[in-house]
């Protein structure tokens, strides 16, 4: 008996020494008795099933003995890529028992996550679309390639979406409700607004992309971290079964206190090939203290105002990857029509929409998308904030003489914010046809794609700074060198001599 007792005590000591950490969240708003449990990366499917069976019996025993918590037990189960885990409501003794399992990585209290946007006045001009396809603020047209995100699926992880709004043209579907409130609609308006910016016919950037609504926040704009993680899990699995994660974008215009579980889930989605656009937060503080904005593998977005300054509310710091329009943005409203909102919540969907646009246009995916956004952007932001490593504002290539087809859509009018408008050509001419003395819309030299064709993938050429384009060789320019021009674009001695006599 003495030997058995010694062995039991030794095993208990080893178990305690190897117990997983129960993380502390002193500055967060926690959900009482609700926890997120993450398993170690080497946990097999069989190990995970065994742990769940053990949890069920342990939890039942503890609850039966104490009967102190209502509606207790497992709520969400996570299982994608390397990440396995679950969330639920458990008493203190059960949590201690869970932490002792050597397959458990950590236990984290469930915290409240909120949207990063707020409603402002209605019927103000939506300037964001025009800004992302022009070199300077103040433009009133949005120039884009006709591919417009076709073939890409965008996941709106938010408050839900009014998928029947006319701006979505039937391209939006309801996906999942992780709030479990039985209310499959957007009672907040936040998710419909952000989705309109991403894929709407009038207010959207990727006007041909599909949208899937994933509700993780309630009608008050808040919800537990456990539901956010479940929404990420669901989105990744849905993407894998419907076109692939490399043709999927996830927008997360939300955030809360720093969460290892939420950051880990976001990182796993990126590792699977999805592009994640995340709002930096609206507290005018270091975004490093917020999740999922602090996750290095996502594209974290700060907000800009109409004059290209950082929005006064926008978070800043080393976590920021890029800026996008976020002040006074007009977009879709549940039930029809439009409304204006401000926040990094409004900036992130500009990035998500542009990501979908570029993925369709150039065939890129995952982490390469954020890098491409930085390449195409303009160094325009003033007062980016302490420790912020970038002042780049997103652009679709139009600011650098880039690749979009000349197919501009007028920016929404203040007097008719919800009227759909068809894209119209921005100037006359023969885009795609080289002819002497006339620059091409959006590109001052031959190479512009024919209408209806996708633009080429190479990086855009610099936009000439003046109407004369002094450093760009094209017919009719002041510094035009015909020999260099012909050798580069056409070649052939017979044709060179004939056209040389014509132009000279």
Curated annotation (Swiss-Prot):
Ranges for region Disordered: 172-198, 282-312, 378-483
Domain annotation Peptidase S8: ranges: 126-400
UniProt keywords, alphabetically: Glycoprotein, Hydrolase, Protease, Secreted, Serine protease, Signal, Virulence, Zymogen
Species of origin: Trichophyton rubrum
Name used for this protein in its record: Subtilisin-like protease 1
Extent of Polar residues compositional bias: 282-294, 378-394
Gene3D superfamilies (UniProt xref): Peptidase S8 propeptide/proteinase inhibitor I9, Peptidase S8/S53 domain
Propeptide: 20-116
The keyword Chloroplast appears for this protein: no
Pro residues composition-biased segments: 405-449, 457-473
């Amino acid at each position: 008996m003495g030997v058995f007792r010694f062995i039991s005590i030794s095993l208990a000591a080893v178990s305690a020494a190897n117990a997983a950490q129960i993380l502390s969240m002193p500055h967060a708003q926690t959900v009482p008795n609700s926890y997120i449990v993450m398993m170690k990366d080497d946990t097999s499917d069989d190990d995970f099933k065994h742990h769940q069976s053990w949890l069920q019996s342990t939890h039942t025993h503890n609850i039966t003995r104490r009967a102190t918590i209502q509606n207790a037990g497992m709520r969400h189960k996570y299982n994608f890529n390397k990440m396995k885990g679950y969330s639920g409501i458990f008493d203190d003794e059960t949590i201690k028992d869970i932490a002792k399992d050597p397959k458990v990585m950590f236990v984290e209290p469930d915290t409240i996550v909120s949207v990063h946007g707020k409603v402002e006045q209605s019927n103000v001009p939506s300037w964001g679309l025009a800004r992302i396809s022009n070199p300077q603020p103040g433009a009133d047209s949005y120039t884009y390639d006709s591919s417009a995100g076709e073939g890409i699926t965008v996941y709106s992880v938010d408050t839900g979406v009014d998928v029947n709004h006319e701006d979505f043209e039937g391209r939006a579907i309801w996906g999942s409700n992780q709030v479990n409130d039985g209310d499959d609609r957007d009672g907040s308006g936040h998710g419909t607004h952000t989705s309109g910016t991403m894929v709407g016919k009038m207010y959207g950037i990727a006007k041909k992309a599909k949208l899937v609504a994933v509700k993780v926040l309630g009608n008050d704009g808040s919800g537990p971290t456990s539901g956010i993680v479940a929404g990420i899990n669901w989105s990744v699995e849905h993407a894998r079964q419907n076109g692939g994660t490399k043709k999927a974008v996830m927008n997360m215009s939300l955030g809360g206190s720093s969460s290892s579980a939420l950051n880990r889930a976001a990182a796993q989605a990126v590792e699977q090939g999805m592009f994640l656009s995340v709002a930096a937060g609206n507290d005018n503080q270091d975004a490093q203290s917020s999740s999922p904005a602090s996750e290095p593998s996502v594209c974290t977005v700060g907000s800009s105002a109409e004059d290209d300054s950082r929005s006064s509310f926008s978070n800043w710091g080393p976590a920021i990857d890029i800026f996008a329009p976020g002040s006074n943005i007009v977009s879709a409203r549940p039930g029809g029509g439009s409304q204006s909102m401000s926040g990094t919540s409004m900036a992130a969907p500009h990035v998500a929409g542009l990501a979908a646009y570029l993925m369709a246009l150039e065939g890129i995916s995952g982490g390469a998308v954020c890098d491409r956004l930085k390449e195409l952007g303009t160094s325009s932001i003033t007062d980016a904030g302490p420790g912020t490593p970038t002042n780049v504002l997103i652009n679709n290539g139009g600011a650098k003489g880039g690749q979009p087809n000349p197919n501009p859509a007028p920016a929404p009018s203040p007097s008719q914010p919800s009227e759909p408008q068809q894209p119209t050509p921005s100037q006359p001419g023969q885009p795609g046809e080289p002819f002497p003395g006339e620059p091409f819309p959006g590109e001052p030299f031959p190479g512009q794609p024919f209408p209806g064709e996708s633009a080429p993938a190479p990086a855009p050429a610099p936009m000439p700074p003046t109407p004369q384009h002094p450093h760009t060789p094209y017919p009719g320019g002041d510094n035009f060198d015909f020999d260099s021009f012909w050798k580069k674009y056409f070649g052939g001695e017979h044709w060179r001599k004939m056209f040389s006599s014509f132009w000279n």
